[in-house]
Regions:
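Generic structural signal of hydrophobic/aromatic residues within well-ordered alpha-helices
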Residues: 7, 22-26, 37, 69-72, ...
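Long, charged low-complexity interaction segments
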Residues: 1-32, 84
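Non-catalytic, well-ordered alpha-helical scaffold segments
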Residues: 5, 20-21, 35-38, 55-63
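Short, cationic/aromatic linear interface patches
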Residues: 41-85
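Short cationic/low-complexity microdomains
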Residues: 32-44
C-alpha cells in the first residue's frame, strides 16, 4: 500500500512514526483505506494521552489501532449514510 501523502505527517505528529510500517500492514491486510487510518491514528493518540502504553508499546499499539480502525470505519459509514439521506 503506498503511503498517503498526509498519513506520515499524522503518524509523526502523534508520536507513532516508528509504527507506520506495522499500521500499513494491518490496514492492508484488513482492507482499510488511508482516510480510515488517519481517523484511527488520531483516536489512538487520544487514547495514549489517557491510557499510555506502559509495557509493550508495539502490542498496545496493534491492539488499540485495530480497535480504532474498526471504530473509524463504523463512524465514516454512519456519516455517509446520514449525509445521503
Amino acid at each position: 500500500m503506498p503511503v498517503h501523502p498526509e498519513l506520515e505527517g499524522y503518524f509523526l505528529a502523534t508520536g507513532f512514526a516508528d509504527l507506520l510500517p506495522l499500521a500499513l500492514k494491518m490496514a492492508q491486510r484488513d482492507g482499510y483505506g488511508p482516510e480510515e487510518m488517519i481517523e484511527a491514528i488520531c483516536m489512538v493518540a487520544d487514547k495514549a494521552k489517557t491510557y499510555p502504553p506502559t509495557r509493550n508499546r508495539v502490542a498496545w499499539f496493534a491492539t488499540v489501532f485495530r480497535e480504532k480502525l474498526r471504530q473509524a470505519r463504523a463512524q465514516m459509514k454512519a456519516y455517509e449514510r446520514k449525509t445521503r439521506g
